[in-house]
Every structure is written in structure tokens, then in C-alpha cells.
Amino acid sequence: MSELKKKSLTRGQLGAIVGAVAASLLVTAFLGWSITCPCDFTPGGLLFGDRAGEEIADWSFANDVSLCQIQVGGLLPYSVNLNCMATSSGGLYLSCSVCDTKRWAGVVVGNDRARMRLDGTVYPVTATRVMDPDELDRAWVARVAKLRVHNTPINPAPPVGT
């Protein structure tokens, strides 16, 4: 009888095993979700890809890719698909209509460090909300120019003259 007691698990040991299995399943699910998303309108977690070593000064190449992704947050990363566009001087802008309702934009207010993935490469960035009307106009002109090249049914180019 005493041998049987020695071989059985205590409640604490069983709880630890169940907890470890549950934690590993959650980590596996999060990594799987991060690998496949952000996708369409579903946010993702970590952005994987080749890593650029330093921040980029000239983002003009951003106009050559149709989709950009941003990752914000620290402990629990949050990433979304969005439009990004560069001005003729190489400045990078991100589309954010009704920005106050976007989770990623709210996170950036408290922590401006983020990561952008363009064409499989992940870049460190510092995100700043633009409020200056002249700078917003430059970003809008860059957005319209890019959407005329990368026009999709989900993200159509604005009508000429806007």
C-alpha cells in the first residue's frame, strides 16, 4: 500500500502538470496566431521576419509595397495591417482614420516604440501622432499617390481631385 502512495501524484503535482500543459498550449497558440496574423481585419501579435538593424531615414521604398503592418505594445504585442506611405522626401506616414478608436494608436500614445513589417522585413520605428495641418496634407498627398498605384477593392484609390 505504501508503494502505491509513493507512485501517485499529489494534487499539487497534478495541478502543476495541468498548468504547464495549459501554458505551453497558450504559448503555442499565440505563436501560431502571430505567424499567420495580422490577416485582413484580424489583429496579430509578434511580427516575424528579417530584422533591420537600425531605424530608416528614407522610407520611399514603402510606396513599393501594398501592405504594411505595425506592432505596438510590450509584454503582449499587438499588430495590425494598415496603409503606409512615404512622401517624396522619404518621410513615413501611417493611415489612421478615426484614430481615437484604434487600439494600436492608443498604445502608441503611451509608448512610441513600435515595429513595422514591410515586404517581410521588420524595422524599428518611433511613432508620433501628426496633428499639424500642413504635415497632414503632405501625408494625404502621399497616400493618394500610393493608392493610385496599389488600388484594391478593400482599399480603393480616392477619386481624382480629392
For the regions a protein language model found, what residue spans apply to each?
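Hydrophobic membrane-insertion alpha-helices, especially the h-region
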Residues: 14-33
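Short, structured beta-strand-loop surface elements
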Residues: 24, 99-162
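Short, conserved active-site entrance elements at the starts or edges of catalytic domains
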Residues: 31-78
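N-terminal Lys/Arg-rich, disordered targeting/topogenic segments
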Residues: 1-12
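Generic low-polarity alpha-helical segments
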Residues: 18, 77, 82, 161-162
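A short linear-motif detector with a strong N-terminal bias
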Residues: 47-50, 62-64, 94-96, 103-106, ...
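Short beta-strand segments
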Residues: 62-99, 117, 124-128
